[in-house]
């Protein structure tokens, strides 16, 4: 089993979980700032947005997680803010981040769809890296399996939990998001019929579908009235993505790749 603590500085423990999230954030900010000028968005506005959105998204992710496990946290109030032990629900962070983005874009007079479109692939790569935090914390795993011989030894050993090998669902989602990120990069450079909002829609559909399937393999999912909350939200994401495509096509929204960029 790998030590979840990456660096110990006296009483201060820096966990791999935090490093994975921060690394994903840094890469996401870099990629978004690099794409921003193409949509006539000032890169410094991206930094301003992150300074506001990131802490609020973390808070939203934690609040979402605590709400659906309130029976436990109501008896352990001191653990509500112990995010270093894990327990961040990505959907809570995404919903909070989207709300902050809408308000921020409106105040900065930035087209919301343009902002979402340049942020979507960056969010996907951040999620891909962030899932490795679950790996180090031994969480977000799946059902028991006989063996994991197809995986590298360090992953196989870390997925030996409570006397059994577990499906590395963190890895499946990480790779799924990485593939989605690569496809978005290809689409936005090569697909000339790509309209404003289509990248956001692709993200919602791609991530929603992958999460819905992978969530069914997990054994530690948040439950609500006997159902997996994330699977219901995945259906909402997919439906919303389809609606965005239909709406933007009927509206004849501007193409993502403009004539000047061809």
UniProtKB/Swiss-Prot annotation:
Q: Which EC class is this protein assigned?
A: transferase
Query: What's one Pfam family the UniProt record gives for this protein?
Result: LGT
Enzyme Commission number(s) from the entry:
2.5.1.145
Alphabetized, the UniProt keywords read:
Cell membrane, Membrane, Transferase, Transmembrane, Transmembrane helix
Question: According to its record, what are the GO cellular component terms?
Answer: plasma membrane
Keyword flag GTP-binding: no
For this UniProt entry, the molecular function terms from Gene Ontology, in alphabetical order, are: phosphatidylglycerol-prolipoprotein diacylglyceryl transferase activity
Which Cys pairs are S-S linked? none
A biological process (GO) of this protein is:
lipoprotein biosynthetic process
- Spans through the membrane: 9-29, 41-61, 80-100, 109-129, 167-187, 197-217, 226-246
**Localization per Swiss-Prot or TrEMBL:** Cell membrane
Annotated positions binding a 1,2-diacyl-sn-glycero-3-phospho-(1'-sn-glycerol): 131
Its pathway? Protein modification; lipoprotein biosynthesis (diacylglyceryl transfer)
Please state which protein family the record places this protein in: Belongs to the Lgt family.
What role is this protein assigned? Answer: Catalyzes the transfer of the diacylglyceryl group from phosphatidylglycerol to the sulfhydryl group of the N-terminal cysteine of a prolipoprotein, the first step in the formation of mature lipoproteins.
**Protein name, per record:** Phosphatidylglycerol--prolipoprotein diacylglyceryl transferase
The organism is Streptococcus pneumoniae (strain Taiwan19F-14)
Q: Which gene encodes it?
A: lgt
């Amino acid at each position: 089993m790998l030590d979840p603590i990456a660096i110990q500085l006296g009483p201060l423990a820096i966990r791999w979980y935090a490093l994975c999230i921060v690394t994903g954030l840094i890469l996401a900010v870099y990629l978004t700032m690099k794409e921003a000028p193409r949509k006539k968005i000032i890169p410094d506005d991206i930094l301003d947005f992150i300074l506001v959105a990131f802490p609020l998204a973390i808070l939203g992710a934690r609040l979402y997680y605590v709400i659906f496990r309130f029976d436990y946290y109501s008896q352990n109030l001191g653990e509500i803010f112990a995010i270093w032990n894990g327990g961040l629900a990505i959907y809570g962070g995404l919903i909070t981040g989207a709300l902050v983005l809408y308000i921020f874009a409106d105040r900065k007079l930035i087209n919301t769809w343009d902002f979402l479109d340049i942020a979507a692939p960056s969010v996907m790569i951040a999620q891909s890296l962030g899932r490795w935090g679950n790996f180090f914390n031994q969480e977000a795993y799946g059902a028991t399996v006989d063996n994991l011989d197809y995986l590298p030894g360090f992953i196989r050993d870390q997925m030996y939990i409570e006397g059994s090998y577990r499906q590395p669902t963190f890895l499946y989602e990480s790779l799924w998001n990485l593939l989605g990120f690569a496809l978005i990069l290809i689409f936005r450079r090569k697909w000339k019929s790509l309209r404003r909002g289509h990248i956001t829609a692709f993200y919602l559909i791609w991530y929603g579908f992958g999460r819905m399937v992978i969530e069914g393999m997990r054994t530690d999912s948040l439950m609500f009235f006997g159902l997996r909350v994330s699977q219901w939200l995945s259906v909402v994401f997919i439906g919303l993505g389809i609606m965005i495509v239909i709406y933007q096509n009927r509206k004849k929204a501007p193409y993502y790749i403009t004539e000047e960029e061809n």
